[in-house]
Amino acid sequence: MKVISALLLLIVIVATACDAVIIRDQLNPIPQSASPTLVIIPTKETVLDATYSHQLGVEVIYFAAGCFWGTEKLMQSIPGVDAAVSGYANGLAEIVPTYEQVVSGATGYRETVRVEYKPDVISLDALVFAYYHVIDPTIANAQGYDVGTQYQTGIYYADDAARETVERITAIERQRNESFVVEIKPLERFYEAEEYHQ
Protein backbone atom coordinates (compact mmCIF):
# COMPACT_ATOMS: atom_id res chain seq x y z
CA MET A 1 0.00 0.00 0.00
CA LYS A 2 2.90 2.37 0.76
CA VAL A 3 4.34 1.77 -2.71
CA ILE A 4 0.99 2.58 -4.37
CA SER A 5 0.63 5.74 -2.27
CA ALA A 6 4.18 6.76 -3.12
CA LEU A 7 3.56 6.19 -6.82
CA LEU A 8 0.37 8.26 -6.77
CA LEU A 9 2.15 11.08 -4.96
CA LEU A 10 4.93 10.95 -7.51
CA ILE A 11 2.46 11.16 -10.37
CA VAL A 12 1.43 14.53 -8.99
CA ILE A 13 5.09 15.54 -8.73
CA VAL A 14 5.73 14.43 -12.32
CA ALA A 15 2.71 16.36 -13.56
CA THR A 16 3.74 19.56 -11.79
CA ALA A 17 7.53 19.38 -12.19
CA CYS A 18 7.39 19.79 -15.93
CA ASP A 19 5.13 22.84 -15.75
CA ALA A 20 8.10 24.72 -14.31
CA VAL A 21 10.04 24.01 -17.49
CA ILE A 22 7.35 25.66 -19.60
CA ILE A 23 7.27 28.73 -17.36
CA ARG A 24 11.06 29.01 -17.33
CA ASP A 25 11.29 28.60 -21.11
CA GLN A 26 8.57 31.21 -21.62
CA LEU A 27 10.44 33.67 -19.40
CA ASN A 28 13.80 33.00 -21.07
CA PRO A 29 13.02 31.84 -24.60
CA ILE A 30 15.81 30.83 -26.94
CA PRO A 31 16.10 33.63 -29.52
CA GLN A 32 14.84 32.70 -32.99
CA SER A 33 18.14 33.83 -34.48
CA ALA A 34 20.14 31.53 -32.19
CA SER A 35 21.44 28.42 -33.86
CA PRO A 36 22.91 25.58 -31.83
CA THR A 37 26.57 24.79 -32.25
CA LEU A 38 27.09 21.20 -33.28
CA VAL A 39 30.02 19.22 -31.89
CA ILE A 40 31.16 16.75 -34.55
CA ILE A 41 32.27 13.27 -33.49
CA PRO A 42 34.86 11.78 -35.86
CA THR A 43 33.14 8.38 -36.12
CA LYS A 44 29.53 7.30 -36.39
CA GLU A 45 29.90 4.20 -34.23
CA THR A 46 27.34 3.47 -31.56
CA VAL A 47 28.31 5.21 -28.34
CA LEU A 48 25.81 3.48 -26.03
CA ASP A 49 26.41 4.97 -22.58
CA ALA A 50 30.04 5.79 -21.93
CA THR A 51 29.18 7.32 -18.54
CA TYR A 52 27.67 4.15 -17.05
CA SER A 53 29.86 1.60 -15.26
CA HIS A 54 28.13 -1.75 -14.81
CA GLN A 55 27.92 -2.87 -11.19
CA LEU A 56 27.36 -6.41 -9.98
CA GLY A 57 23.68 -6.96 -9.14
CA VAL A 58 22.53 -3.78 -10.89
CA GLU A 59 20.69 -3.57 -14.22
CA VAL A 60 19.90 -0.54 -16.36
CA ILE A 61 16.96 0.68 -18.47
CA TYR A 62 16.33 4.03 -20.16
CA PHE A 63 12.94 5.81 -19.99
CA ALA A 64 11.91 8.84 -22.06
CA ALA A 65 8.71 10.18 -20.51
CA GLY A 66 8.58 13.83 -21.45
CA CYS A 67 10.36 16.18 -19.05
CA PHE A 68 13.22 14.23 -17.49
CA TRP A 69 13.08 16.00 -14.11
CA GLY A 70 9.75 14.45 -13.13
CA THR A 71 10.75 11.02 -14.42
CA GLU A 72 14.02 11.20 -12.50
CA LYS A 73 12.18 12.08 -9.25
CA LEU A 74 9.68 9.27 -9.75
CA MET A 75 12.31 6.62 -10.39
CA GLN A 76 14.52 7.78 -7.51
CA SER A 77 11.62 7.25 -5.12
CA ILE A 78 11.09 3.59 -6.01
CA PRO A 79 12.75 1.11 -3.61
CA GLY A 80 15.39 -0.88 -5.45
CA VAL A 81 16.36 1.95 -7.79
CA ASP A 82 19.99 2.83 -7.07
CA ALA A 83 20.19 5.86 -9.34
CA ALA A 84 18.19 7.84 -11.89
CA VAL A 85 20.23 10.12 -14.13
CA SER A 86 18.83 12.66 -16.59
CA GLY A 87 20.27 12.69 -20.08
CA TYR A 88 19.71 12.55 -23.81
CA ALA A 89 19.22 9.34 -25.81
CA ASN A 90 19.22 8.08 -29.38
CA GLY A 91 19.76 11.25 -31.37
CA LEU A 92 22.12 12.07 -34.21
CA ALA A 93 25.45 10.26 -33.97
CA GLU A 94 27.31 13.31 -35.25
CA ILE A 95 26.81 15.42 -32.12
CA VAL A 96 27.39 15.35 -28.39
CA PRO A 97 24.18 17.10 -27.35
CA THR A 98 23.67 20.06 -25.07
CA TYR A 99 20.31 21.03 -23.58
CA GLU A 100 20.01 23.99 -25.95
CA GLN A 101 20.58 21.74 -28.96
CA VAL A 102 18.10 19.12 -27.75
CA VAL A 103 15.30 21.65 -27.11
CA SER A 104 15.81 23.04 -30.61
CA GLY A 105 14.22 19.82 -31.89
CA ALA A 106 16.90 19.37 -34.55
CA THR A 107 18.98 16.62 -32.93
CA GLY A 108 16.54 13.73 -32.59
CA TYR A 109 17.58 13.26 -28.94
CA ARG A 110 14.94 12.47 -26.32
CA GLU A 111 15.02 13.72 -22.73
CA THR A 112 15.67 10.37 -21.08
CA VAL A 113 16.41 8.98 -17.63
CA ARG A 114 18.91 6.19 -17.09
CA VAL A 115 17.49 4.00 -14.32
CA GLU A 116 19.95 1.79 -12.44
CA TYR A 117 18.07 -0.78 -10.40
CA LYS A 118 18.56 -3.94 -8.35
CA PRO A 119 16.43 -6.71 -9.91
CA ASP A 120 16.43 -8.66 -6.64
CA VAL A 121 14.54 -5.72 -5.05
CA ILE A 122 12.45 -4.31 -7.94
CA SER A 123 11.68 -6.10 -11.20
CA LEU A 124 11.97 -4.54 -14.61
CA ASP A 125 8.30 -5.51 -15.06
CA ALA A 126 7.35 -3.26 -12.13
CA LEU A 127 9.45 -0.36 -13.44
CA VAL A 128 7.94 -0.61 -16.92
CA PHE A 129 4.40 -0.74 -15.49
CA ALA A 130 5.21 2.32 -13.33
CA TYR A 131 6.48 4.10 -16.45
CA TYR A 132 3.30 3.35 -18.40
CA HIS A 133 1.23 4.50 -15.43
CA VAL A 134 2.63 8.06 -15.61
CA ILE A 135 2.75 8.69 -19.37
CA ASP A 136 0.16 9.14 -22.09
CA PRO A 137 1.26 6.58 -24.71
CA THR A 138 -1.11 7.99 -27.33
CA ILE A 139 0.53 11.39 -27.90
CA ALA A 140 3.61 11.84 -30.09
CA ASN A 141 6.26 14.42 -29.22
CA ALA A 142 4.53 15.71 -26.11
CA GLN A 143 3.66 14.93 -22.50
CA GLY A 144 1.46 17.26 -20.50
CA TYR A 145 2.29 20.86 -21.36
CA ASP A 146 5.71 19.94 -22.75
CA VAL A 147 5.71 19.81 -26.55
CA GLY A 148 8.58 19.02 -28.91
CA THR A 149 10.42 16.05 -30.36
CA GLN A 150 12.66 15.93 -27.27
CA TYR A 151 9.58 14.90 -25.24
CA GLN A 152 8.74 11.83 -27.35
CA THR A 153 8.13 8.86 -25.08
CA GLY A 154 10.32 5.81 -25.41
CA ILE A 155 11.91 2.88 -23.66
CA TYR A 156 15.48 2.09 -24.67
CA TYR A 157 16.99 -1.22 -23.62
CA ALA A 158 20.62 -2.31 -23.42
CA ASP A 159 20.27 -6.10 -23.78
CA ASP A 160 18.00 -8.87 -25.06
CA ALA A 161 16.63 -9.79 -21.63
CA ALA A 162 15.41 -6.22 -21.10
CA ARG A 163 14.06 -6.11 -24.67
CA GLU A 164 11.95 -9.21 -24.04
CA THR A 165 10.51 -7.78 -20.82
CA VAL A 166 9.81 -4.37 -22.35
CA GLU A 167 8.14 -5.91 -25.41
CA ARG A 168 5.99 -8.21 -23.25
CA ILE A 169 4.72 -5.39 -21.00
CA THR A 170 4.31 -3.07 -23.99
CA ALA A 171 2.10 -5.65 -25.74
CA ILE A 172 -0.23 -5.50 -22.73
CA GLU A 173 -0.25 -1.69 -22.79
CA ARG A 174 -0.90 -1.57 -26.55
CA GLN A 175 -4.15 -3.48 -25.99
CA ARG A 176 -5.38 -0.65 -23.74
CA ASN A 177 -4.89 2.09 -26.33
CA GLU A 178 -6.05 2.32 -29.93
CA SER A 179 -3.25 4.77 -30.69
CA PHE A 180 0.20 3.93 -29.31
CA VAL A 181 3.32 5.95 -30.12
CA VAL A 182 5.91 4.97 -27.49
CA GLU A 183 9.28 4.19 -29.09
CA ILE A 184 10.64 0.77 -28.14
CA LYS A 185 14.23 0.58 -29.36
CA PRO A 186 17.69 -0.56 -28.39
CA LEU A 187 19.83 2.12 -26.80
CA GLU A 188 22.09 3.59 -29.46
CA ARG A 189 23.69 6.34 -27.41
CA PHE A 190 23.13 8.18 -24.14
CA TYR A 191 24.77 11.31 -22.81
CA GLU A 192 24.23 12.57 -19.27
CA ALA A 193 22.56 15.97 -19.11
CA GLU A 194 24.40 18.95 -17.72
CA GLU A 195 24.96 18.99 -13.95
CA TYR A 196 22.24 21.60 -13.34
CA HIS A 197 19.66 19.09 -14.66
CA GLN A 198 20.63 16.39 -12.15
Question: What function would you assign to each model-found segment?
Answer:
Residues 18-198:
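Flexible coil/turn and secondary-structure edge motifs
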Residues 6-15:
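Bacterial N-terminal signal peptides
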Residues 1-4:
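Positively charged n-region of N-terminal signal peptides that target proteins for export
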